[in-house]
Structure formats: structure tokens, C-alpha cells
Design a protein with these regions (language model features):
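Conserved ABC ATPase signature
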Residues: 140-150
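Conserved catalytic motifs of ABC-family nucleotide-binding domains
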Residues: 161
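Catalytic Walker B motif of ABC-type/P-loop ATPase nucleotide-binding domains
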Residues: 165-168
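Conserved ABC transporter NBD signature motif
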Residues: 64-72
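Short coil-to-helix segment of the ABC ATPase nucleotide-binding domain corresponding to the Q-loop/switch region
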Residues: 102-110
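Helix N-cap at the start of a conserved alpha-helix in ABC-type nucleotide-binding domains
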Residues: 176-178
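ABC ATPase NBD coupling module
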Residues: 19-22, 73-90, 114, 191, ...
């Protein structure tokens, strides 16, 4: 049995006061095995981002427990939670959030500096090498394409060698070809032993995952293993009550992989 990288137990996240309370998450229990790629999907307001933020320690649940490996996040102080995020978790968002005055190398080194560690150039260049941008180390964001900037953001997330990488629509601002390149990098990182959890609206992006979780009204209502873009889109269409067609560009199929068995 593959050990869980992340576990949620009866996690609830409520907003507002009694009488006008809204549940962003409603009694969610979930296990995400190590070295797997999980996509999270659902309509707007379904709880996707809330699930990601609570799982990554960016938001505190109203109830329940969240574990990263053997560490329970819900009981940690803000200081310890910040230290854990900086050392054991990586983040990639739709917005690249690179500092325009810094080079790619300097942007990638930022998490190490924030953690109070002196960046080793070899470690920073290794992260850039992983995303194929070592030769662009001295370029500033304005000198890079959108896809290259997102790859720098990915290298920045990887430089601390995190246990789990979280992505919130990481390809949402990219064209389909560039987005497939970033998704291929995420897939290769999972194949190398990392754990990736990604929120997306895109069936093609979700097809790179091992498992897709579908949320509605703060609950996990379905899941799909070894997904294809067509199967994901069909599931979304049933949820929306509409018929959608997948217009995946040529060559958009995810790389072949063994089908994971539910566990």
C-alpha cells in the first residue's frame, strides 16, 4: 500500500455566521498516495480552491484534520505552519508572481532566502535544469515568454525539494501547446517520485493526472482513475447537465501510464 502524502479527515470549512453560513468544504475525507498526480475539478463555487488551500496549509479548516505525511497541520502554530510550507510544500499558481527586477536564478532562490537558508547556486541551477531553463538563468521575466516564466515559477517551487507540489490552474494563462509542456513537466516530476495536486477547469490538463476528483457543494461527488480528456469532459457535462465537446489540439493526449487501482 502506497503511503499517503496527504490525508484529510472530515474536513469542513465554513464562512459567515450561524443562519447565513456557507460551507466551502463539507465533511471531506480523502487520501492522496505519494508519487501520484491528482487533479481537482468542479464548477465555480464547488470548493476546489478551498480544498487546495486547506490541504496546503494556506487556510485553516473550521473542523476536521489535515495531515502532510505524519504531520497534522491543523494543530500547528502559524510560525510552525509557515516553516513547514517553506520546506515541505511547493506552490505554482496561474499568475507567475515573478519579481520583474530579479533574474530567473534570483527568483528561484527566493524560497531558500525566505526560509533563512543561504542559496547554493548549484541547487538553484539544478531546479532550472529540471524545467529546461538553465541557460536562461540570468534572464529577467520580461525577457522570457509566458511558458518560460511559468517554468521559472515551477523551478522556484521545486528548489526546496518539497514533498508535495500544489498547482492552482498552473496552465490557465498559457496557450495549449505551452500548457502541455508544463503539464508534461509535472507528469515527469510525479514519475520521479513527487506528489502533485492540481486544480483545473481543463479536461486536457486533467488527463495528465492519475486520478481526478470532482467536487460539488463542498463535497467530493465522484472520482475518475486513469482519465482521458474525453472521459473527464463527459463527466463534467453530466454534472452541468450540458453537452460539451472536447476540442483537444493535435498531440494533446497525455503520456501513457499504468492505470491506478482505487485504494
Amino acid at each position: 500500500m502506497n503511503e499517503s502524502a496527504v490525508r484529510l479527515r472530515s474536513v469542513t470549512r465554513s464562512y459567515g455566521r450561524a443562519g447565513g453560513e456557507v460551507k466551502g468544504l463539507d465533511q471531506v475525507t480523502l487520501d492522496i498516495p505519494r508519487s501520484t498526480f491528482t487533479a481537482v475539478m468542479g464548477p465555480s463555487g464547488s470548493g476546489k480552491s478551498t480544498l487546495l488551500h486547506c490541504t496546503a496549509g494556506l487556510d485553516r479548516p473550521t473542523g476536521g484534520q489535515v495531515f502532510l505525511g505524519g504531520t497534522e497541520l491543523t494543530g500547528l502554530s502559524e510560525r510552525r505552519l509557515t516553516r513547514l510550507r517553506r520546506g515541505r510544500i511547493g506552490f505554482v499558481f496561474q499568475a507567475f508572481n515573478l519579481l520583474p527586477s530579479l533574474t530567473a536564478e534570483q527568483n528561484v532562490a527566493l524560497p531558500l532566502r525566505l526560509a533563512g537558508r543561504r542559496p547554493e547556486r548549484a541547487q538553484v541551477l539544478e531546479a532550472l535544469e529540471q524545467v529546461g531553463l538553465r541557460e536562461r538563468a540570468r534572464h529577467r521575466p520580461g525577457e522570457l515568454s509566458g511558458g518560460q516564466q511559468q517554468r521559472v515559477a515551477l523551478a522556484r517551487a521545486l528548489v526546496t525539494r518539497p514533498e508535495v507540489l500544489f498547482g492552482d490552474e498552473p496552465t490557465g494563462a498559457l496557450d495549449s501547446t505551452t500548457g502541455r509542456g508544463v503539464l508534461g513537466l509535472l507528469r515527469s516530476m510525479v514519475d520521479d517520485g513527487r506528489t502533485v495536486i492540481m486544480v483545473t477547469h481543463d479536461p486536457v490538463a486533467a488527463s495528465f493526472a492519475d486520478r481526478v476528483l470532482f467536487l460539488a457543494d463542498g463535497r467530493i461527488v465522484d472520482e475518475l482513475y486513469a482519465p482521458s480528456a474525453e472521459r473527464v469532459a463527459a463527466r463534467m457535462a453530466r454534472a452541468d447537465g450540458t453537452v460539451r465537446a472536447v476540442s483537444a489540439p493535435a498531440g494533446a493526449e497525455a503520456p501513457a501510464r499504468a492505470e491506478a487501482a482505487p485504494c
